[in-house]
Amino acid sequence: MVRAQIRLLSPSERTLAAEMIAQEVECDPHFIAAKTVAVFMPLGDEPPIREAVGRWATEKRIVVPRVEGDDMRFFDFDSSDMARGSFGIDEPQMTAECPPEQIEVMIVPAVALARNGARMGRGRGYYDRYLGAANATRIYKIGTCFACQLVDELPTEPHDVVMDRVVAR
């Protein structure tokens, strides 16, 4: 049902929502203080934050995920080094890897988010595994989605990682 609502959003509504999400993230004290921020490269049904990512990269070290088998690792963002990778997502090819302990803030996509920070992903567990690792638990997690993806409650399992903040527009 959430995905059907996303399909009803016009391109201009998606772009406006993404810019509002970016502005709210930019005002977050954790984001402001962070030197290294992990972000996602959006799929078609996720907020199109790519423009904001380019803007952030002028002031911060931005790292983006690359999926290798069952693992997700983060690498420096360089817009000239991106290529379609796993699941049709733009991924870095030749940039330096960023260890989890250097990431201070992570902007996380979601299929749905609950107001308490519970997150529903795409079901493969990449973000939960990465963020659940001992050396990644201190990362400040900002879950992002369109307003139509925000719900009151989501069922959770012990391995699910809760977001520290939810930004939905």
Regions found by a protein language model. Name each.
Residues 72-169:
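Conserved phosphate- and dinucleotide-binding cores of soluble alpha/beta proteins
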Residues 1-102:
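N-terminal active-site beta-alpha-beta segment that forms phosphate/nucleotide-binding
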